């Protein structure tokens, strides 16, 4: 029950922020043009700063576990490959990129540490899970959203070059790289800088969620209900059911299993919507999957946690 309450506290708050954005739009306080400007701002400043702050304070050398990081990386890569394969069955090719990203991209950085701290009292292996998965999440998001952009026809040198430039100049990837470099060099984080990073990064989620809610089109969302439900099922149930037994067989337990659970089965992150909108996609599937997985993840995560506890794994 405690885990259900914790999950509900985390997910309901996120959902209410989206509803608040929708409400602001309906009463004329946050029109679509304003919401789109907020999206661009969140994408360029607060979100990269948030990820930088999460990774910069991690002691990589002390917490390092090569097997665990490699496992997280490989499973993330396989998950993305599966999502790409399933997306080929979609009739509407214009939503393929959004579907792929929404199906694999978790709220790992935002939810991972908090979820494990609630259970064990410390962040455990969450930082290593973030290192193994989040950089790949974002690099592949740029690749997927570039190659499967609406109206895009085939691959060519210009597209490959544009994608590579997109990866190296993507604000989120720059934030992750800066955070990892800061941590690897063991640079001190002055109190003033830490407070500034926390303050700027702290607005990423609420602003991004409200902007997403403000641009959410209910009619269009219902028109994309089938791919939305499929992507949400893959995100919350499919990948966990496939890969969690493998993690158990390999020997991962307790904090590591919880970190893997969050990586595989947490709600789709709001940054997937922010990035999709900023890379020329409609954003309807992204926002719909974020909303649906956010509503359902409190119950699915708690269900998976209950199953693992019954088997004495956590």
What function would you assign to each model-found segment?
Residues 1-314:
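Alpha-helical transmembrane segments of multi-pass small-molecule/ion transporters
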